[in-house]
């Protein structure tokens, strides 16, 4: 959430930001509500001052007529204060609701654009494999290797669910252990987070659990949701707390299941493991001071690049355009892995790294206390370490040979115990 005073003092910039983010929000209405709130606060303070003066007068020696007048004045002031307080709560609630519809401000380097097709490629790492045969996609490879059962998932749970089996299970566990060890060695504290969060916490992180376009599963009648990412549970971990500046940055690695409706997702690129309703993900999350957030954002992206380089997966980095940013993100990079099983081969998103500045911290009231005892909002950042289902796609499709065998990256062999996957189904 943006600071009210910042909005009031930067109306044109906020309006332009809403425009480039392709968001519908009435900035003028927000400013009007803010001005009303400021006026009401001033009036309320004046009424409270008058009430206190009247109370002091009541303590002095008064004749009956003067005391009766003070009593009437006190009663009238009490009624006016109660009315002003009710009105202030009403205006404050309207202001909060309207302001929460605003996205974060946008970094100057973020390209303008409306969708992921407008994202800007900034680098490539690794060389896509050059096959002498027509590469299979991960769905066909998984069938040959007998490591994923999509049909059983559909029968038991519905479309976009699946069973991992045999070496597929061991490969997922190997990726998890590789990722946890990698991050722990670099100062991250591992977490295994809940799969359910309160609706208020989900909203506080900037996710919308309601509406037809929401990707969040809500639990009927409980005001709780299945988490779509450990960003929710790690971001809410310090809600309402004041941290010590000397304890920052705090680096967390959260392992969780992720549940997503994937409303409206369709097409060949949504096939198989790419868009599913449940998957496992290892998420990086950071709390830091405002002065550290841009450098820490670069570090999260660098760690993602290290992970995918170690996994021998060719990838590119893109700067996400303004129209494709989620509301909390100030700046965001995506890593896209080469997926040769797509017709002709193409890039598919496998990670993101977002700097959300103090947008989420204001909504969840997460602050830190500096050396002078002053309190400030922290900056909060997140980045995908490993979205397991999508990593499996890239591993299978890039590591395949003409016979359907798949070579396992050396970084994973100590964790899974095998160097190749072999076909079981002819």
UniProtKB/Swiss-Prot annotation:
Q: Where does L-serine bind?
A: 229-231, 283, 384
Q: Does the keyword Aminoacyl-tRNA synthetase apply?
A: yes
Q: What is its main location?
A: cytoplasm
Keywords assigned: Aminoacyl-tRNA synthetase, ATP-binding, Cytoplasm, Ligase, Nucleotide-binding, Protein biosynthesis
> Can you tell me which residues the record assigns to a coiled coil?
none
Provide the function of this protein: Catalyzes the attachment of serine to tRNA(Ser). Is also able to aminoacylate tRNA(Sec) with serine, to form the misacylated tRNA L-seryl-tRNA(Sec), which will be further converted into selenocysteinyl-tRNA(Sec).
The record's subcellular location field reads: Cytoplasm
Give the range the annotation lists for the signal sequence: none
Q: How does it assemble?
A: Homodimer. The tRNA molecule binds across the dimer.
What does the entry list under GO cellular component? cytoplasm
EC number in record:
6.1.1.11
Q: What is the phylogenetic placement of the source species in the record? A: Bacteria, Pseudomonadati, Spirochaetota, Spirochaetia, Spirochaetales
Query: Can you state which reaction this protein catalyses?
Result: tRNA(Ser) + L-serine + ATP = L-seryl-tRNA(Ser) + AMP + diphosphate + H(+); tRNA(Sec) + L-serine + ATP = L-seryl-tRNA(Sec) + AMP + diphosphate + H(+)
Top EC class for this record = ligase
User: What's the record's remark on domains?
Assistant: Consists of two distinct domains, a catalytic core and a N-terminal extension that is involved in tRNA binding.
The molecular function terms of the Gene Ontology recorded here are: ATP binding; serine-tRNA ligase activity
Task: State the family named in the UniProt similarity comment for this chain.
Answer: Belongs to the class-II aminoacyl-tRNA synthetase family. Type-1 seryl-tRNA synthetase subfamily.
Query: Mind telling me which residue stretches traverse the membrane in this protein?
Result: none
| Gene Ontology biological process | selenocysteine biosynthetic process; seryl-tRNA aminoacylation
The name under which this protein is listed is Serine--tRNA ligase
* InterPro entries xref list: aa-tRNA-synt_IIb, aa-tRNA-synth_II, aa-tRNA-synth_II/BPL/LPL, Ser-tRNA-ligase_type_1, Ser-tRNA-synth_1_N, SerRS_1_N_sf, SerRS_core, tRNA-bd_arm
């Amino acid at each position: 959430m943006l600071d009210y005073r910042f909005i009031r003092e930067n109306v044109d910039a906020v309006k332009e930001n809403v425009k480039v983010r392709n968001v519908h929000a009435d900035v003028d209405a927000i400013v009007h509500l803010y001005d009303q709130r400021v006026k009401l606060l001033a009036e309320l303070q004046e009424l409270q001052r008058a009430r206190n003066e009247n109370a002091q007068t009541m303590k002095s020696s008064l004749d009956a007529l003067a005391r009766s007048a003070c009593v009437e004045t006190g009663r009238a002031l009490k009624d006016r204060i109660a009315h002003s307080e009710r009105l202030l709560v009403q205006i404050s609630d309207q202001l909060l609701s309207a302001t929460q519809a605003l996205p974060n401000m946008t970094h100057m380097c973020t390209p303008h654009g409306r969708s992921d097709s407008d994202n800007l490629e900034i680098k490539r790492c690794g060389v896509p494999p050059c096959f002498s045969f027509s590469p299979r996609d991960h769905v066909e490879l998984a069938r040959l290797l007998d490591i994923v059962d999509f049909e059983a998932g559909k029968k038991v749970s519905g479309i976009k669910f699946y069973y991992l089996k045999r070496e597929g299970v061991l490969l997922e566990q190997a990726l998890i252990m590789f990722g946890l060890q990698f991050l722990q060695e670099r100062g991250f504290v591992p977490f295994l987070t809940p799969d359910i969060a309160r609706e208020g916490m989900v909203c506080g992180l900037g996710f919308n659990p309601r509406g037809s376009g929401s990707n969040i599963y809500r639990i009927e009648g409980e005001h709780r949701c299945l988490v779509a990412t450990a960003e929710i549970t790690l971001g809410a971990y310090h809600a309402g707390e004041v941290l010590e500046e000397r304890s920052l940055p705090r680096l967390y690695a959260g392992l969780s299941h992720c549940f997503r409706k994937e409303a409206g997702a369709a097409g060949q690129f949504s096939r198989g493991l790419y868009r599913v309703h449940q998957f496992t993900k290892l998420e990086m999350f950071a709390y830091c001071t405002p002065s550290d957030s841009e450098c820490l954002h670069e570090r999260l992206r660098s760690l993602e690049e290290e992970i995918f380089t170690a996994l021998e997966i060719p990838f590119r980095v893109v700067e996400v355009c303004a129209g494709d940013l989620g509301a909390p993100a100030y700046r965001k990079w995506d890593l896209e892995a080469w997926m040769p099983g797509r017709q002709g081969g193409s890039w598919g998103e496998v990670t993101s790294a977002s700097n959300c500045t103090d947008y989420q911290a204001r909504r969840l009231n997460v602050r830190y206390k500096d050396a002078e005892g002053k309190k400030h909002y922290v900056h909060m950042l997140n980045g995908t370490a490993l979205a397991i289902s999508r990593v499996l796609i890239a591993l299978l499709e890039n590591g395949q040979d003409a016979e359907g065998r798949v070579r396992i990256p050396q970084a994973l062999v100590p964790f899974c115990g095998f160097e190749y996957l072999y076909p079981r189904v002819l």
